[in-house]
């Protein structure tokens, strides 16, 4: 997944949408459909076919996800975020309005704040909410959330248990992910020699 994801992002950033779509299809064939891959397809639909293509694909997703309120909401916001005409202010206003529906529901409020606003999180408290809801999605989504939570914790100087860092070091020998390697390098950890080129 990581190698294909890097390949996909290279195609996306170079505006080679045809190859980007092929790579997303390869990822889904090899490791399954994920919330991440659906979000990327919405971006590609917007770039290739404009707003109409974006909304057509969203409509197809919502038909399948109609009984899952969390999934439907995330897909709608991913679609909105992919729109070329969406400003950051408009996006944040829409998210703030949406979050008001969950002010009495701490778990859902924190989860959507994390997923939609990329807010600073309290590592100890919010991590359990994030993974509690993310566990209904794919392994890719769980993995991405884990890395993102660690990145934000590190950036905001939130202490992360040494046991977690030890596990990350072990995993870094198996998974060639530059995000994980960078976290270890910034901590002053020795990165596995075979992976140094990605730091």
Predicted regions located by residue number:
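Alpha-helical segment of the N-proximal tetratricopeptide repeat
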Residues: 2-22
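Start-of-helix register in tetratricopeptide repeats
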Residues: 2-3, 36, 69-74, 108
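Charged, helix-prone or intrinsically disordered regulatory segments positioned adjacent to compact structured domains
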Residues: 60, 64, 75-82
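Alpha-helical repeat scaffolds
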Residues: 17-27, 50-65, 87-106, 123-199
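Short, charge-rich amphipathic alpha-helical segments embedded
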Residues: 22-49
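Residue-level signature for tetratricopeptide repeat
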Residues: 6-10, 40-47, 77-85, 114-118, ...
